[in-house]
Amino acid sequence: SCSHHSGLYEHAEKIMSQHPDSVLTLLSTIQDVNDLSEKDRAMYYLLLTEAEDKTYKKHESDSLIAIATEYFDKTDDVKRKAKAWYYRGRVVDDLKDAPRAQDYYLKALQNEMEITDYAFLGRLYNSIGMLYTYQEVYEKAVFYQKKSLRSFELLKDSIGQSFVLR
């Protein structure tokens, strides 16, 4: 059963950016999340939270994504560790807890130099910049928005650039 899930998760990660709704459908085929290994459960909640975020579902609680941050924080999986903290930040941002969101976003940056996913970095910097904007800390806001812009430029992602410039 374990290898079956790792294949499913890999597929889910591949199609996430284009088809997050399909990821939700895929994840719904897993019968009992409590029967999963610790790693598989962490992956499940990370993918679930990411797919819900990308399909604009409102987050109600950070207890599930917390399982992912607790697991990945103990690993060397830089990308998933960063993603778990980012999505935990997104969740508490939804819950209107800006200080905690900021804390989690900055935790997502702890291995910044090792992250090569520029689309992810662009979104992360943008989220940090937006929070600083709301707090009227404009110098830091501009710093992170510029970093966001640079990430999307590296991607040649015109959609991403227009998203930051609005």
Go through the PLM ranges and name each one.
Residues 2-166:
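A "functional boundary" signal
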